[in-house]
Amino acid sequence: MSGFTGAGYPKAIPPALARHIEQSNQEGGQFRIGVWTGASTAPELDGVLAQAHGIQMRLPYQSDPSCRQLINAGQMLYTDMHLSHVAQFAWFGFLGKLDVAVVEVVGVLPDGRLIPSTSVGN
């Protein structure tokens, strides 16, 4: 997901995704995702997904108490790397396959180009 501080991360997708994860888990499934961001986000992303037990792996930086608790309990994988290394690691495939990217934008131009918010940080 895009994210570089609390100002620039998707606002609507994480809570909706957390609800979907909780429902899946209640039905016996185990739906979890990897969360890669440019930096820290906010409780409305990390917190809601962690509380839903929906994050399998988090990188490169997080500051959420719910995430920290799961990381320290060994229930969430965490890779603590310098922010500047994430893009290169992703490009070279060291982090595995990226299936979906969620990026916060403030607008879409008529030709389809996106206008990113402050979410573009790395």
Name every feature range the model reports, one short phrase each.
Residues 2-122:
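Conserved alpha/beta enzyme-core scaffold
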